[in-house]
Amino acid sequence: MSASNCLRCLVRPSAVALVPRQMLQVGGGSLTFTATAATKGASSANTGGRQNANRPQKLRFKKTKKKNVVSSGKPPLPGERKAYRKKIVLSNNNALPVPGLETLRPNDLAKQDNVGSVKALPEDVVDALRAMEAFKPTQCWGIFRQPSVLIRQETVDLTKKMKAAGADGKTIRMVIEGNRVTGKSLLLLQAMTHAFMNDWVVLHIPEAQELTTAVTEYAPIENSPLWTQPTYTLKLLQSFKRANEKVLSRMNTVYSHADLPQIIPVNSPLLQLINSAKEADGAWTVFQALWRELNAENVPGRPPILFSLDGLAHIMKVSDYRNPAFELIHSHDLALVKLFTDCLSGATVMPNGGAVLGATTRGNSPRSASMELAIAQREAEKAGEKEVPQRDPYSKKYDDRVEAVMKSVEILRLKGVSKTEARGLLEYWAASGMLKKRVDESMVSEKWTLSGNGVVGEMERASLLTMKA
C-alpha cells in the first residue's frame, strides 16, 4: 500500500508548479525591497495590471496612408531622354591644341605616306557627318580639342578603291567585319569623309536596328509586296539634304515625276524636289524620284554615290513587323532595306559609280547564321583555301535570301592597329594632354600588348578611361 501511495504522490500536481514563472523569478531573488502604495498604483497603471501581462495583444490592421513625395523638378519632356542619350560632344576647350596638327585634304586618306598619322577633320565635313549621324555616343570625341582621325592601312586601301571606282564608273560592294571595338564604325566615318571631300553624294543609315525592330511606323505599298516606313524616310531625306546641300545645289532634275506631292518641272533644282516632301505620307515617293535622278545615265555632273549602313546583322533576319495576317515580315520586304540589299548584292546598279558599304557590329547585335557563313565563305575564297565552310545540315537557322545578298560581296576584316599606327595615336593623345606618360618604344609595346595586339577600343580603355566624362 505504501508503494501505491508514493506513486500517487508522483503524479499529483505539486503546489510549486501552480505558481506563475514570473512570481518564481521575482520571489526567488536575493533582493528584498518595499514599495509604497503610490508606487504600486503607478506601476499598475503603466503595465495595465499584472494579471493582463500574459494576455495576447490584438493585431490592428489599420491602413496608414503614405506621405506624398513632393517632386523637386518637372518631368522630362517627350524625347528629352533620347536626345540626352544620343548627345554628341565633338570638342573640349580645356584640351590642349595639338601643335602641327594638319587638316585633312581631299586626297590625304588615300596616300600611303599618311599611314600612322592623325589629321583633323574639316569643319564643313564635321557638320555633314553630324547631319548624317556618323558620330557615335560611345566614341571619345569630347575629350579632345577638335575631332581627328587616325589614318590606318585599311583606310588607305578602302579610299583607294573608292577613288578608282569613282573614276571608272564602277561600284565596290564591301562588308566591314571585325571584332568588338576594332573601329568598324570609325572606318565608315572615314569613308564618308573621303566622299564628302571629293564631292560624292552620301546616303547613310546610322542604325539599322531602327528599321527592323518595329519602332517606327510602316505601311504597305499598293500593288507591291514591299512595305514603306514613311516617318523614317522623311527623316532620312532631311538629313540627306543637310549633309549634301553643297553638291545637290549644282544639280537639276532631268525627269518628270507625276506622283510627287507637288509638281516639279523638268530642269528644276534637285533641292526643290527634296523640299517637296513636307509630310511623311509622300516621303517614299519623293525618295524614289530622288534615287532615280541621282542614278540618271549619261547626264553630266552626276557624282558617284556612297550608300552605307551600320549594324548589318539587323537587316539580315526576319524583322519584328507583322502583316495583317499577323505573320512576321522579312527585313528584305521593307522598301529601304530592299534598296540597300539590292545595291549590296549588285542587283541594282549605280551607273555613275560609287560604293556600297555595310559594317557589322558586336554590341546589341542579333545572330545571323547565313551572314556569318557567307563572310566565312568569302574569306576562305579570298585566301584560296580548298575547303570552303558549308551549312550545318542539322540547323534550320539559314536564310536563302541573306545568302543571295552576300554571295559576291568583298570582305574587309578589321584587326588591331600596327605598332607604328599605335605610336601615332599615343603621341596624339599625349600632345592633347590626355596621356601623362612619355611615349617611347617600351610604352608603345606595353599598350599595344595590353590592348590585344592593338585593338583601338582596348587601347582607349587602358589609357583614356579615367579621362572620359
From Swiss-Prot:
Domain of life: Eukaryota
Gene Ontology terms: cellular component: mitochondrial small ribosomal subunit
Keyword Transit peptide: yes
Cysteine pairings via disulfide bonds: none
GO process terms (BP): mitochondrial translation
Binding site for ATP: L150
A Pfam match: DAP3
GO molecular function term, any single one: structural constituent of ribosome
Location(s) in or outside the cell: Mitochondrion
Keywords: Mitochondrion, Ribonucleoprotein, Ribosomal protein, Transit peptide
Summary of subunit composition and partner proteins: Component of the mitochondrial small ribosomal subunit (mt-SSU). Mature N.crassa 74S mitochondrial ribosomes consist of a small (37S) and a large (54S) subunit. The 37S small subunit contains a 16S ribosomal RNA (16S mt-rRNA) and 32 different proteins. The 54S large subunit contains a 23S rRNA (23S mt-rRNA) and 42 different proteins.
Protein family (similarity comment): Belongs to the mitochondrion-specific ribosomal protein mS29 family.
PANTHER family: MITOCHONDRIAL 28S RIBOSOMAL PROTEIN S29, SMALL RIBOSOMAL SUBUNIT PROTEIN MS29
Biological role: Component of the mitochondrial ribosome (mitoribosome), a dedicated translation machinery responsible for the synthesis of mitochondrial genome-encoded proteins, including at least some of the essential transmembrane subunits of the mitochondrial respiratory chain. The mitoribosomes are attached to the mitochondrial inner membrane and translation products are cotranslationally integrated into the membrane.
The name this protein goes by in its record: Small ribosomal subunit protein mS29
Originating organism: Neurospora crassa (strain ATCC 24698 / 74-OR23-1A / CBS 708.71 / DSM 1257 / FGSC 987)
Gene name per UniProt: rsm23
